[in-house]
């Protein structure tokens, strides 16, 4: 009867081990099949079109030259109202270095003792009574100590640059005259897509006569560049590597 129970317990342990192994393998496989979430954040406002901007109407006076269609010699053609287009010259360079080093050492040692007047094999006085304590010498000593240390070091370097141009649209005119702009550019190459999104606030004085402005003069810039093609996948670690970095305890 004992042998039967032992064999049954071994079979149960084997089944449980196989079940745990199967769950671990399934988790790894499913994590590899899961797609990497795309970080394409939406803007706080809707796309620029259609803007439903009312067309300015000028009464017809019957003349060959209408005042509403006239362009004066000193007219400023720079963007200044909702719907106007501005070209942003991208010249973004980012170079960051960070180095941290920490070291921690702590040591603690404590000793205390109890002195006795009894010799080996004699009686000692404990709470007013005589107690025979074999092996008690001149005293009892107790000591303990603890040591702790920690050392950490990190060195992070990041460098990136982005150059080019993107056309954006004025979506809002603030009360102080500054312009809120936004725009995006989608480029599909083979099986991948490159997406550039740009948003910010510009001063009309910084806009050149040809309706261009450098990105360094734009305030509150929100610049997103995303590559969903093969080249973008090569810059990201695989699913197994991501899983190990997230759940591996060491």
From Swiss-Prot:
Attached lipid, kind S-diacylglycerol cysteine, located at 33
> Which superkingdom heads the taxonomic lineage of this protein's source?
Bacteria
What the entry lists under Pfam families is as follows:
FlgH
Q: What is its main location?
A: membrane
Topology relative to the membrane: Lipid-anchor
Give me the residues lipidated as N-palmitoyl cysteine. 33
- Any GO BP annotation: bacterial-type flagellum-dependent cell motility
Q: Which residues form the signal peptide?
A: 1-32
Q: What is a GO molecular function of this protein?
A: cytoskeletal motor activity
User: What function does the entry list?
Assistant: Assembles around the rod to form the L-ring and probably protects the motor/basal body from shearing forces during rotation.
**What protein family is recorded?**
Belongs to the FlgH family.
Protein name (Swiss-Prot/TrEMBL): Flagellar L-ring protein
Question: Gene encoding this chain?
Answer: flgH
């Amino acid at each position: 009867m004992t042998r039967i129970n032992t064999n049954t317990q071994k079979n149960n342990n084997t089944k449980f081990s196989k079940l745990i192994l199967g769950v671990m393998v399934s988790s790894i496989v499913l994590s590899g099949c899961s797609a990497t979430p795309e970080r394409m954040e939406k803007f706080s406002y809707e796309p620029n079109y259609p803007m439903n901007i009312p067309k300015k109407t000028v009464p017809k006076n019957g003349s060959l030259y209408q005042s509403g269609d006239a362009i004066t010699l000193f007219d400023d053609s720079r963007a200044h109202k909702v719907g106007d287009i501005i070209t942003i010259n991208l010249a973004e360079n980012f170079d960051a270095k960070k180095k941290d080093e920490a070291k921690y050492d702590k040591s603690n040692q404590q000793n205390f003792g109890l002195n006795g007047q009894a010799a080996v094999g004699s009686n000692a006085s404990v709470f007013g009574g005589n107690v025979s304590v074999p092996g008690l010498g001149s005293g009892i000593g107790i000591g303990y100590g603890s040591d702790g240390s920690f050392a950490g070091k990190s060195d992070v370097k990041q460098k990136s640059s982005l150059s080019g141009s993107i056309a954006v649209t004025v979506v809002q005119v603030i009360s102080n005259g500054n312009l809120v702009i936004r725009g995006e550019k989608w480029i599909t190459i083979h099986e991948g897509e490159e997406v550039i999104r740009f948003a910010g606030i510009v001063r009309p004085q910084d806009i050149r006569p040809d309706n261009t402005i450098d990105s360094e003069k734009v305030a509150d810039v929100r610049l997103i560049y995303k590559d969903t093609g093969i080249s973008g996948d090569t810059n990201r670690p695989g699913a197994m590597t991501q899983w190990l970095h997230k759940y591996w305890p060491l």
